[in-house]
Amino acid sequence: MNKQQLKAYFMLMRLHRPIPILLILWPTLTALVLASHGLPDISYLVIFTIGVVVMRTVGCIINDIADVDFDKHVARTNTRPLTSGQLSIKNAIWLCISLTLVAFICVLFLNLYTILLSFVALFLAILYPFCKRFFAIPQLILGLAFNFGIFMAFSAIQNQIPVEAWIFYLATICWTIAYDTIYALADREFDLEIGIKSSAVLFGNKVFRYILLFNFLSLLLLIILGIYCDFNSFFYLGVVICSLFFVRNYFLYKKLGITNCINAFSANHWIGLIIFIMAVIQYI
């Protein structure tokens, strides 16, 4: 394998773009803290961090395999390794299988409940790339997939999925729909041309209102989580800071343009970090 091929594999796995990894990792780590009522055992942190990174790359590979014909028509994606011919579909499938096995080995160190949930997580990871063909809001499926680690974190530590896990899961789904709609704005014109469905296409000229609506719902659910878990004022301070980030982002993505939308999307990882820090503060 030469240097060019290694670079192509690196690009296929999206390791040069860590922001989506953080968007998955922060809610998962927050769930570990909530489930542990404090800092979790280091083994859980290692297993779930590896799992997030590996499954994010698996999702990217599946997405590129599914979209290889569509990506040729989109300026932002027509240089990807599969689309440009740097790697074959066979190469991608073998890498995907190998990484999935790595993730499965990690989950074998957890309890049976979590192992069973991992199959649901894999199903969602496979479903998302294909639902863009028939489902009007694929961002909902992405929200289910990206944040499923919340359920797995609670099941691994508590062997159950309590009410607070469901509240937090719903909050992160709303958050994901909002930030991925911003991301989809960058490709909306191309998606309209080639028939790909997205929330950015569905919401049309009301898209900014819907992004703000889902931002609001995520904040509301976080407040409900704080009340249910009897969190102190520091948690609500974090919610206020998140709301300010959402307002700041609004003035960025409303300008449209690929750069503005991608920057607004990327800034969302700070939301995840803030909530994680506020959760940790509750137990120190």
From Swiss-Prot:
Entry superkingdom: Bacteria
Broad EC category: transferase
Output one GO MF annotation. 4-hydroxybenzoate polyprenyltransferase activity
Topology with respect to the bilayer: Multi-pass membrane protein
Which Gene3D superfamilies does this entry report, sorted A to Z? UbiA prenyltransferase (1.20.120.1780)
Q: Which GO terms describe its biological process?
A: ubiquinone biosynthetic process
Major place of residence: membrane
Q: Where in the cell is it found?
A: Cell inner membrane
Signal sequence: where? none
Q: Which cofactor does it need?
A: Mg(2+)
Per the record, the pathway is: Cofactor biosynthesis; ubiquinone biosynthesis
User: Matching InterPro entries, A to Z?
Assistant: HB_polyprenyltransferase-like (IPR006370), Prenyltransferase (IPR039653), UbiA_prenyltransferase (IPR000537), UbiA_prenylTrfase_CS (IPR030470), UbiA_sf (IPR044878)
Q: Which NCBIfam families match?
A: ubiA_proteo
Q: What is this protein called?
A: 4-hydroxybenzoate octaprenyltransferase
Q: Which organism is it from?
A: Francisella tularensis subsp. novicida (strain U112)
Q: What is the lineage of its organism?
A: Bacteria, Pseudomonadati, Pseudomonadota, Gammaproteobacteria, Thiotrichales
